[in-house]
């Protein structure tokens, strides 16, 4: 279980959220909602252990993630705004490298992941020669290879066509059905997802005081 405990985040003298607490249990899909500037990306980075909260802590399986960040990151797949892939490598080589870090290499699984994101035929091109959208799809292909139980995804559906969105949403449902956890931000309507999606809404009136920030959990 992932637990956010009394998290407060202040950026540029502005409080994005204050005393925010919630838990995510195995089998859940959770969407972080809120207007631009409400702190959605900051929250995801804090939960992923890539940024520090001004107050509070993040627990994974009842332990503060600061105690063993490396072990926590073995259980986590984080996809941010940047693809996080190596531009000098090809899509196939990027996925091969990613897979080799966590598990035994399975070339067939890599080919299947490339097929799922529509990159068969581009597997031998350096990533630097691909469009921004194609680079994004290389990053998303890691979802089909990841053994991590916790997925934290910042706008994973951006610049993805309708069929691609449907494919990704089906994968999220499949991951949750196996006991995984999916935490994401998106501007897409998830009403059609065949799985209960819990929503955490961050609201911020853009005032300087922390008292102006609030959070509602649906």
Curated annotation (Swiss-Prot):
Keyword Transport set for record: yes
GO molecular function: ABC-type heme transporter activity; ATP binding; ATP hydrolysis activity
GO biological process: cytochrome complex assembly
Entry membrane topology: Peripheral membrane protein
Keyword Disulfide bond assigned: no
Assigned EC number: 7.6.2.5
Subunit relationships: The complex is composed of two ATP-binding proteins (CcmA) and two transmembrane proteins (CcmB).
Designated name of the protein: Cytochrome c biogenesis ATP-binding export protein CcmA
Organism lineage string: Bacteria, Pseudomonadati, Pseudomonadota, Gammaproteobacteria, Enterobacterales
């Amino acid at each position: 279980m992932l637990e956010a405990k009394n998290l407060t985040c202040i950026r540029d003298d502005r409080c994005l959220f204050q005393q925010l607490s919630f838990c995510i249990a195995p089998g859940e899909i959770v969407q972080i909602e809120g207007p631009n500037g409400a702190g959605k990306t900051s929250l995801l980075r804090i939960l992923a252990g890539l940024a520090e909260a001004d107050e509070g802590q993040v627990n994974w399986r009842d332990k503060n993630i600061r105690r063993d960040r490396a072990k926590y990151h073995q259980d986590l797949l984080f996809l941010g705004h940047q693809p996080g892939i190596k531009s000098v490598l090809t899509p196939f080589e990027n996925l091969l490298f990613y897979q080799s870090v966590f598990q035994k290499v399975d070339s067939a699984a890599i080919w299947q992941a490339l097929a799922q994101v529509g990159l068969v035929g581009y597997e031998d091109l350096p990533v630097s020669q691909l469009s921004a959208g194609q680079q994004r799809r290389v990053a998303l292909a890691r979802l089909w290879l990841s053994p991590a139980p916790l997925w934290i995804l910042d706008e994973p559906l951006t610049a993805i066509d309708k069929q691609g969105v449907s494919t990704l949403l089906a994968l999220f449902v499949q991951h949750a059905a196996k006991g995984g956890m999916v935490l994401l931000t998106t501007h897409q309507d998830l009403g059609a997802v065949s799985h209960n999606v819990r929503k955490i809404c961050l609201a911020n009136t853009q005032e300087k005081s922390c008292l102006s920030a609030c959070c509602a959990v649906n």
